[in-house]
Design a protein with these regions (language model features):
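Nucleotide/phosphate-binding catalytic cleft detector across ATP-hydrolyzing
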Residues: 1-61, 77-189
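A general structural signal for short secondary-structure boundary/capping elements
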Residues: 43-44, 67-69
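Short beta-strand scaffold segments in enzyme catalytic cores
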Residues: 62, 69-74
């Protein structure tokens, strides 16, 4: 998603550790994870999240709250695809840029649906709006696939939304990093 950042990281590892960096999507992970989508169109962060949760017996929906809000569907050891929605902070920034009278707001969880001022109304709209988006997408995946899933939240705003679903949700803060480490251990066997 951020090629310039990846390029800087790649150069850093080459300069200071004399080693090459590879993206997960470009590595042979076929015995670890079956990828059922076009590899060129999936982010390595999403693959890392999938690798982190695979256990050959459970189905997972991983919701990653980052620049985008990603929903990834993993069945047993297969990455089946997902959903990409706009990230909350990105959407907030865009709203204040495009609507000059809307202030730039630091997102906070709202307990009241009806806001009493602009800031509380924005927080309410984003909290309840994204809660509905998350709930609807997860239920739509379940309905369409006719499977049961364990739900994992990760990323910066994961804890804020944990209790906004009726389904049981587990928070895994280091999911992406754990997936990269799991892939590295697999590749270095």
């Amino acid at each position: 998603v951020v090629p310039n950042c990846y390029k800087k990281i790649k150069n850093y590892f080459k300069l200071y550790f004399n080693t090459n960096c590879n993206e997960l999507k470009n590595l042979n992970l076929s015995k670890l994870l079956s990828i059922k989508v076009n590899r060129k169109q999936i982010g390595s962060d999403r693959l890392a999240n999938a690798i982190s949760v695979i256990d050959n017996k459970n189905n997972y929906i991983v919701v990653d709250f980052g620049t985008a809000t990603n929903f990834d569907v993993i069945s047993a050891n297969s990455y089946n695809g997902g959903v990409i929605a706009p990230g909350i902070n990105l959407s907030l920034e865009n709203l204040s840029k495009k609507a000059s009278l809307i202030p730039n707001v630091k997102f906070k969880k709202s307990n009241n649906v009806v806001g009493k001022n602009t800031i509380s109304a924005i927080n309410s709209g984003f909290f309840f709006g994204y809660s509905g988006l998350i709930d609807n997408i997860i239920h739509s995946i379940i309905k369409q696939t006719k499977k049961k899933y364990k739900i994992i939240f990760t990323g910066g705003l994961a804890k804020m939304f944990k209790n906004s679903l009726k389904l049981r949700v587990k928070i895994k803060s280091n999911l992406t990093t754990d997936g990269v480490l799991k892939a590295a251990m697999y590749l270095n066997k």
